[in-house]
């Protein structure tokens, strides 16, 4: 029987303690080895919480699937901030460029239901709203409208999804 352990771990810094150790221990796998593999696969997400799925089959073979961090975490990493605004709408904590929004949208490609880059970019911009992050110096909602109106089409030219 295959067992699956899902956890949210710090990128590149998972450890054998909770939540991984107690969940993997009863499965009889080498926890240290699994944690090392997870850290290797998540090191690019240093400082962010990363969803991982550890799949252990009957023969104790381990497969590790790494998801992408939450959109808010990716935005904070791009901006170099620790947290969003506690007073969104009146307090701005950062400004993100449209190219950074596109970069995050590409990273989230596998995890979203959108069918194209533009729609995923709008989702990323939507996450900026409650965080107090502006896009290209204006409120994120206004940037979403500008995206719909084609203002950033030159950036997206030739982009395949």
Swiss-Prot record:
A Pfam family matched by this chain, by name?
Ribosomal_L11
Keyword rRNA-binding tagged: yes
Q: What is this protein called?
A: Large ribosomal subunit protein uL11
Record GO cellular component, one term: large ribosomal subunit
Q: Assembly and interactions?
A: Part of the ribosomal stalk of the 50S ribosomal subunit. Interacts with L10 and the large rRNA to form the base of the stalk. L10 forms an elongated spine to which L12 dimers bind in a sequential fashion forming a multimeric L10(L12)X complex.
InterPro entries the record matches:
Ribosomal_uL11, Ribosomal_uL11_C, Ribosomal_uL11_C_sf, Ribosomal_uL11_N, Ribosomal_uL11_N_sf
Database matches in SMART domains: RL11
Q: Which GO terms describe its biological process?
A: translation
What family does the Swiss-Prot or TrEMBL record give for this protein?
Answer: Belongs to the universal ribosomal protein uL11 family.
Please give the Gene3D superfamilies that the UniProt record associates with this protein.
Ribosomal protein L11, C-terminal domain, Ribosomal protein L11/L12, N-terminal domain
UniProt function note? Forms part of the ribosomal stalk which helps the ribosome interact with GTP-bound translation factors.
């Amino acid at each position: 029987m295959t067992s699956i352990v899902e956890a949210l771990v710090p990128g590149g810094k998972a450890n054998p303690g909770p939540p991984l150790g107690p969940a993997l221990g009863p499965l009889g796998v080498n926890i240290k080895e699994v944690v090392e593999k997870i850290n290797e696969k998540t090191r690019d997400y240093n400082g962010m919480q990363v969803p991982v799925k550890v799949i252990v089959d009957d023969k104790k073979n381990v497969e590790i699937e790494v998801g992408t961090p939450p959109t808010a975490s990716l935005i904070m990493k791009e901006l170099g901030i620790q947290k969003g605004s506690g007073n969104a709408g009146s307090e701005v904590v950062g400004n993100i460029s449209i190219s950074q929004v596109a970069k995050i949208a590409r990273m989230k490609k596998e995890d979203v239901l959108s069918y194209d880059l533009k729609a995923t970019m709008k989702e990323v911009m939507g996450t900026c709203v409650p965080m107090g992050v502006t896009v290209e110096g204006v409120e994120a909602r206004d940037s979403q409208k500008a995206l719909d109106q084609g203002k950033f089409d030159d950036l997206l030219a030739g982009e395949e999804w």
